[in-house]
């Protein structure tokens, strides 16, 4: 998860830190053995009219559930006298906006250690973070089209949304390979109001100002 860290919200989407103005405070809320997907609407996965942020959040949560279920079944299938381990699933809430689910298994008969972690975070990126992000993403600021700093600043930051799934699996068998992959999605949105308090004519809750996917394996 993102952890209760400092004013640095790590958007690993750029393999760097993007500094936010407010501290990140997470609270662990529940501990279970499986992620809860009872509120997921899987129909949005194939709905091209649904917002991509909704589809991607649903996808990473559903994939996490499938992976944890399959790994637990594999762990339970041991037949050489060892006691299978169980996943510990912790759900956390980010006070500044967002949530996550961390699933960890360790010291098992099949898996030495494994984790499948989902993060869904949102809030406002300050101008400094937007400028840093723009430098690494092909003049993003110019493409978004807002003046963010100086006396003529139109906005004092931009709303953002980020979600992703990160998975690391270390089998107990030294002949079995370690697996590591992550899927990520990030978007910047048009603010509802400009810095001077007037309505933003470009605001559309379903049309991000910029978005991209990331990840690797």
What are the residue ranges of the model-derived segments?
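Terminal signal-anchor or tail-anchor transmembrane helices
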Residues: 1-21
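Generic ordered-secondary-structure signal
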Residues: 4-10, 26, 64, 70-74, ...
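Gly/Pro-rich turn-and-neighbor structural signature
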Residues: 48-153
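C-terminal segment of N-terminal export signals and the immediately downstream linker at the start
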Residues: 16-43, 47
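Charged, low-complexity surface segments at secondary-structure and domain boundaries
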Residues: 39-54, 214-217
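Aromatic- and glycine-enriched beta-alpha-beta binding-site module
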Residues: 119, 123-217
